[in-house]
C-alpha cells in the first residue's frame, strides 16, 4: 500500500479552496447572455468550444491531489444539478464557490464550522420557501419558448423549436435530440405509438413507391411467443378474413410455415395482413406488448395469463384507426383502448419511474410513457461544422431539460434576480448564536453572486447592478443582453424555479461538507527514479555492416 500524505485544519481547507477556485473560475465566465467561451483541447480531433458550464467542469483534472479533491467536489455539484434539473450548472458552481470562500474566512477567524453549516442550512431552507412563493406556472407556448431561449444562451430558434415540440407531443411526450445531415435545425413529430420494428417480409408492402405498408381500421393480434405452425393461427385468421378487415400481427417472431402462409394469402388478396416482430427484449418486451394491448383495447396472448393463440376470438384483438409499417418502424395511430385502462397504465409507469434508481431504466420507462400518452418529437440539430454541431447539440439538450423543469415547477424572474428577491426572507430567521448567524450572512452574500457574475461577464460593474436590483421589486432586474433595467418576466428573461432551487441546494450541501473538513488524505507521489545510463560502446561483431 502506497504511503499517504495528510493535511489538517486550515492547510487542508486552503488546498481544497484552491481547487474549487480553479474549477469555478473556469466555469463562471460562461454565465449569462454575454458569457464567454471556453476552449477545451481534445486528445484527437479539433478542440471543443463551449459555453456549457458542466462540459467545462467535466474536463477539469488538477495535478495536485488535494486541489483536485476540491475541484472534484464542485464538479459533482455541477453534474448532479445537470442530472436533476438539466441546467443551472454554472449557477450551482458559483454559489458553491461563494459559500465556501466566505465560510473558510470565518473558520480561519475562529468561528465554529458546524454552527456555520447549521446557519447555511437554515438560510437555504428559507430561500427555497421564498422561491416557492415567487414561482408562477408556465401559461403558454411563448413562455416555454422564452425559457428554452435563455437556457440555450439566447438562441431564439432553439427556444421556439422546443416550445413547438412540447406543444405537439404534450408535456409528457418524448423529445429526443439528434444530429441533422444539413445546416438547418428542424423538428420531426411522430404521432401515435411508434416502436423500432419493421415488416418481416417486403411482400407485406401496400405502397411500393414509399416502401411502406398502410392498414386502415386494422385488427391487431398481439402474441408474446414465436409463431411457426399455421394451425395455431388459422382459427383467428378465418374469423378476420370473414370480416374483410386488415390484420397486424405483433409477435416475438413469425417464421416458417406461418410466415409463408401469410405472404401467400396477402399476394392472392385473400387477406390484407402485415407481420412485425415485438419490440424490446425479455421483461421489457412483455411490458411493451402489454402497453400495445392497453392502447388498442386488445388482449396479449401470453402463457403467464394462460391465454392460447388457438383460442383467440375477434373480441380479443386490438383495434386502431391506422397502422403504418416501414422497413424499420411501426406506428399505431389512434388506438381504440379503454380510456380508464390507459390512465391506469400511465399511472403505473409513472410510479415505476419514481421508484427506479437506474438512469437507463428511467429513460426507457419515460419512452414507454410518452408512447402511450402522446407521441415522439425529434429535434434534428443542424450546423456548418462538427465542432459547432456538438456545441449546439449540448445547448439544445440543456434548453430542453430547463424547459421541462419550468413546466414541472413553474418560472421565476431570470438573470439572478429571483435569488436577490429571496434576501428579505433571511431577516426573520432566528439564529442560536453568532456563529450560526454568520452562516446565514454567508448565504445572504452568496445568493447575490450569480447576478454579480452575469453583469460582470456583460462588462458592467457587478456591485452597482446588485445594489440597483436590490432596491427594485418583483421581476425588476438587469437584462444583460440589452444592458437595460426592466421587468424581466415581461422581457422574457425567466428561469425555471426547479433549476434555481436545485442549484442552491446542491451547492450549499457540498460547500457545507468542504467547510466542515478537518483532514484531507491523498496518496504521496512517488519520487521519480532516474533513468539508468545507456550502456557504452556499440554492438559487438557488427563492424562490417552498413
Curated annotation (Swiss-Prot):
<dbReference type="InterPro" id="IPR027413">
    <property type="entry name" value="GROEL-like_equatorial_sf"/>
</dbReference>
<feature type="binding site">
    <location>
        <begin position="30"/>
        <end position="33"/>
    </location>
    <ligand>
        <name>ATP</name>
    </ligand>
</feature>
<feature type="binding site">
    <location>
        <begin position="87"/>
        <end position="91"/>
    </location>
    <ligand>
        <name>ATP</name>
    </ligand>
</feature>
<feature type="binding site">
    <location>
        <position position="495"/>
    </location>
    <ligand>
        <name>ATP</name>
    </ligand>
</feature>
<feature type="binding site">
    <location>
        <position position="415"/>
    </location>
    <ligand>
        <name>ATP</name>
    </ligand>
</feature>
<protein>
    <recommendedName>
        <fullName>Chaperonin GroEL</fullName>
        <ecNumber>5.6.1.7</ecNumber>
    </recommendedName>
</protein>
<dbReference type="GO" id="GO:0051082">
    <property type="term" value="F:unfolded protein binding"/>
</dbReference>
<feature type="binding site">
    <location>
        <begin position="479"/>
        <end position="481"/>
    </location>
    <ligand>
        <name>ATP</name>
    </ligand>
</feature>
<feature type="compositionally biased region" description="Gly residues">
    <location>
        <begin position="536"/>
        <end position="546"/>
    </location>
</feature>
<comment type="function">
    <text>Together with its co-chaperonin GroES, plays an essential role in assisting protein folding. The GroEL-GroES system forms a nano-cage that allows encapsulation of the non-native substrate proteins and provides a physical environment optimized to promote and accelerate protein folding.</text>
</comment>
<dbReference type="InterPro" id="IPR002423">
    <property type="entry name" value="Cpn60/GroEL/TCP-1"/>
</dbReference>
<keyword id="KW-0547">Nucleotide-binding</keyword>
<keyword id="KW-0067">ATP-binding</keyword>
<dbReference type="Pfam" id="PF00118">
    <property type="entry name" value="Cpn60_TCP1"/>
</dbReference>
<dbReference type="GO" id="GO:0005524">
    <property type="term" value="F:ATP binding"/>
</dbReference>
<dbReference type="InterPro" id="IPR001844">
    <property type="entry name" value="Cpn60/GroEL"/>
</dbReference>
<dbReference type="InterPro" id="IPR027410">
    <property type="entry name" value="TCP-1-like_intermed_sf"/>
</dbReference>
<dbReference type="InterPro" id="IPR018370">
    <property type="entry name" value="Chaperonin_Cpn60_CS"/>
</dbReference>
<comment type="subunit">
    <text>Forms a cylinder of 14 subunits composed of two heptameric rings stacked back-to-back. Interacts with the co-chaperonin GroES.</text>
</comment>
<keyword id="KW-0413">Isomerase</keyword>
<dbReference type="GO" id="GO:0042026">
    <property type="term" value="P:protein refolding"/>
</dbReference>
<keyword id="KW-0963">Cytoplasm</keyword>
<feature type="region of interest" description="Disordered">
    <location>
        <begin position="525"/>
        <end position="546"/>
    </location>
</feature>
<keyword id="KW-0143">Chaperone</keyword>
<dbReference type="GO" id="GO:0140662">
    <property type="term" value="F:ATP-dependent protein folding chaperone"/>
</dbReference>
<dbReference type="InterPro" id="IPR027409">
    <property type="entry name" value="GroEL-like_apical_dom_sf"/>
</dbReference>
<dbReference type="GO" id="GO:0005737">
    <property type="term" value="C:cytoplasm"/>
</dbReference>
<feature type="binding site">
    <location>
        <position position="51"/>
    </location>
    <ligand>
        <name>ATP</name>
    </ligand>
</feature>
<comment type="similarity">
    <text>Belongs to the chaperonin (HSP60) family.</text>
</comment>
<dbReference type="GO" id="GO:0016853">
    <property type="term" value="F:isomerase activity"/>
</dbReference>
Amino acid at each position: 500500500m502506497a504511503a499517504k500524505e495528510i493535511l489538517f485544519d486550515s492547510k487542508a481547507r486552503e488546498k481544497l479552496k484552491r481547487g474549487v477556485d480553479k474549477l469555478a473560475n473556469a466555469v463562471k465566465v460562461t454565465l449569462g447572455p454575454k458569457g464567454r467561451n471556453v476552449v477545451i483541447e481534445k486528445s484527437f480531433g479539433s478542440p471543443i468550444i463551449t459555453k456549457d458550464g458542466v462540459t467545462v467542469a467535466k474536463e477539469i483534472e488538477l495535478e495536485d491531489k488535494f486541489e483536485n479533491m476540491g475541484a472534484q467536489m464542485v464538479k459533482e455539484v455541477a453534474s448532479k444539478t445537470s442530472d436533476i434539473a438539466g441546467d443551472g450548472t454554472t449557477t450551482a458552481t458559483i454559489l458553491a464557490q461563494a459559500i465556501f470562500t466566505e465560510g473558510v474566512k470565518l473558520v480561519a477567524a475562529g468561528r465554529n464550522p458546524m454552527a456555520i453549516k447549521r446557519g447555511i442550512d437554515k438560510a437555504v431552507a428559507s430561500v427555497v420557501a421564498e422561491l416557492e412563493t415567487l414561482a408562477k406556472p408556465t401559461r403558454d407556448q411563448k413562455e416555454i419558448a422564452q425559457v428554452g431561449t435563455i437556457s440555450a444562451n439566447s438562441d431564439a430558434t432553439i427556444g421556439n423549436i422546443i416550445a413547438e415540440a412540447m406543444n405537439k407531443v404534450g408535456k409528457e411526450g418524448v423529445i429526443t435530440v439528434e444530429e441533422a445531415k444539413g445546416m438547418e435545425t428542424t423538428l420531426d413529430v411522430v404521432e401515435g405509438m411508434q416502436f423500432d420494428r419493421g415488416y418481416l417480409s417486403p411482400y407485406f408492402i401496400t405502397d411500393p413507391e414509399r416502401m411502406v405498408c398502410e392498414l386502415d381500421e386494422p385488427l391487431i393480434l398481439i402474441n408474446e411467443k414465436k409463431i411457426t405452425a399455421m394451425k395455431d393461427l388459422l382459427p383467428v385468421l378465418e374469423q378476420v378474413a370473414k370480416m374483410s378487415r386488415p390484420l397486424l400481427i405483433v409477435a416475438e417472431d413469425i417464421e416458417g410455415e406461418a410466415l409463408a402462409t401469410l405472404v401467400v394469402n396477402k399476394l392472392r388478396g385473400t387477406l390484407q395482413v402485415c407481420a412485425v416482430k415485438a419490440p424490446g427484449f425479455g421483461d421489457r418486451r412483455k411490458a411493451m406488448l402489454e402497453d400495445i394491448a392497453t392502447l388498442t383495447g386488445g388482449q396479449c396472448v401470453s402463457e403467464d395469463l394462460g391465454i392460447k393463440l388457438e383460442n383467440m376470438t375477434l373480441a380479443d384483438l386490438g383495434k386502431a384507426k391506422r397502422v403504418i409499417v416501414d422497413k424499420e418502424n411501426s406506428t399505431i395511430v389512434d388506438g381504440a383502448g379503454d380510456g380508464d385502462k390507459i390512465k391506469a397504465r400511465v399511472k403505473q409507469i409513472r410510479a415505476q419511474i419514481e421508484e427506479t434508481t437506474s438512469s437507463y431504466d428511467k429513460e426507457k420507462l419515460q419512452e414507454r410513457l410518452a408512447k402511450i400518452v402522446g407521441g415522439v418529437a425529434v429535434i434534428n440539430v443542424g450546423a456548418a461544422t462538427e465542432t459547432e454541431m456538438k456545441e449546439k447539440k449540448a445547448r439544445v439538450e440543456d434548453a430542453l431539460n430547463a424547459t421541462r423543469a419550468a413546466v414541472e415547477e413553474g418560472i421565476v424572474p431570470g438573470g439572478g434576480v429571483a435569488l436577490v428577491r429571496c434576501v428579505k426572507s433571511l431577516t426573520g430567521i432566528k439564529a442560536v448564536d453568532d456563529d450560526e448567524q454568520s452562516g446565514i450572512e454567508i448565504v445572504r452574500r452568496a445568493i447575490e453572486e450569480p447576478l454579480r457574475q452575469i453583469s460582470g461577464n456583460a462588462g458592467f460593474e457587478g456591485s452597482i447592478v446588485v445594489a440597483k436590483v436590490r432596491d427594485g421589486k418583483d421581476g425588476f432586474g438587469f437584462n444583460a443582453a440589452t444592458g437595460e433595467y426592466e421587468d424581466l418576466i415581461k422581457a422574457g428573461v425567466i428561469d425555471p424555479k426547479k433549476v434555481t432551487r436545485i442549484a442552491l441546494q446542491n451547492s450549499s450541501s457540498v460547500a457545507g461538507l468542504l467547510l466542515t473538513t478537518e483532514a484531507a488524505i491523498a496518496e504521496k507521489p512517488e519520487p521519480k527514479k532516474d533513468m539508468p545510463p545507456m550502456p557504452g560502446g556499440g554492438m559487438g561483431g557488427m563492424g562490417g555492416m552498413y
